[in-house]
Regions:
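Bacterial N-terminal signal peptides that target proteins for export
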Residues: 1-7
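N-terminal leader/targeting segments and the immediate start of mature chains
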Residues: 2, 17-61, 71, 75, ...
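Bacterial N-terminal signal peptides
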Residues: 8-16
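Beta-turn initiation residues at beta-strand->coil junctions
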Residues: 51, 80, 174-177
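An acidic-aromatic
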Residues: 65-114, 183
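Flexible, surface-exposed loop/linker segments and immediately adjacent secondary-structure boundaries
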Residues: 107-141
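Gly/Pro-enriched, hydrophobic low-complexity segments
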Residues: 129-208, 212-215
Length: 215
């Protein structure tokens, strides 16, 4: 999966999906508008997430946990046990702890990017969207939205978005790619508008690490 795809909006819910009538029946247009409006209210965020990857051809499964920090516009930092990915909107640093290697590249986005910014700005222009149902949880209903890229050349086949109805925040996102690899991000904790410092989005290269500059 590409560096850009790892920015997800990122973002352990196992409930039966219900398609019966709910207290409020939402349309796709209403849900996407509410998501966009909620995103406009966020200047920065710190998200603790769990990531589950199921590789399509081998059925091997992996679990990770990490922290996503984001700040508008186009500033992201994703940290996990395996790697750190940082961008200031101009440059991307991808550091592998196991290899002690830093790959540096120019930050690029396209219409099918899964970065939070592009994802929200391009709804619904670049995706076919459908409502798949609801999940009942103690904290309230979760709305399940399925998105399919309109571009047949997209690396992503589909995205399932789990939205908390009473806050309009993303609680889980499931990405299926053309290799049938399914990547799930589940939000464990989220803090909004904490005034994250700009220096958070510049990577300090560890001494002695190998540098691969692709710019």
């Amino acid at each position: 999966m590409s560096i850009k795809t790892k920015f997800a909006a990122m973002l352990t819910f196992f409930c039966v999906i219900e398609t019966a009538a709910q207290e409020k029946e939402w349309t796709v247009k209403q849900v996407t508008e509410q998501l966009h409006h909620r995103y406009e209210m966020i200047d920065d965020a710190v998200v603790q997430f769990e990531q589950h990857v199921k590789f399509g051809f081998s059925n091997i499964e992996q679990n990770f946990s990490g922290i996503l920090k984001m700040k508008k516009p186009k500033h992201y930092r994703v940290e996990s046990d395996q790697q750190t990915i940082v961008t200031d909107g101009k440059t991307v640093w991808a550091y592998s702890k196991a290899n002690n290697q830093v790959i540096i590249d120019t930050y690029k986005e396209n219409s099918n990017s899964i970065s939070p910014e592009q994802f929200m700005l391009n709804l619904p222009a670049n995706y076919y969207a459908s409502l798949m149902g609801y999940e009942k949880q103690a904290a309230g209903n979760i709305i399940l939205l399925k998105l399919v890229p309109k571009d047949d050349r997209s690396f992503v086949k589909s995205v399932k978005v789990f939205v908390e109805e009473n806050t309009w925040m993303l609680r889980k996102i499931v990405i299926l790619d053309v290799n049938e690899t399914e990547t799930t991000y589940a939000v464990k904790d989220m803090k909004l508008n904490t005034n994250i410092k700009e220096k958070t989005f510049t990577f300090e290269i560890p001494a002695g690490s190998e540098i691969v500059d692709l710019r």
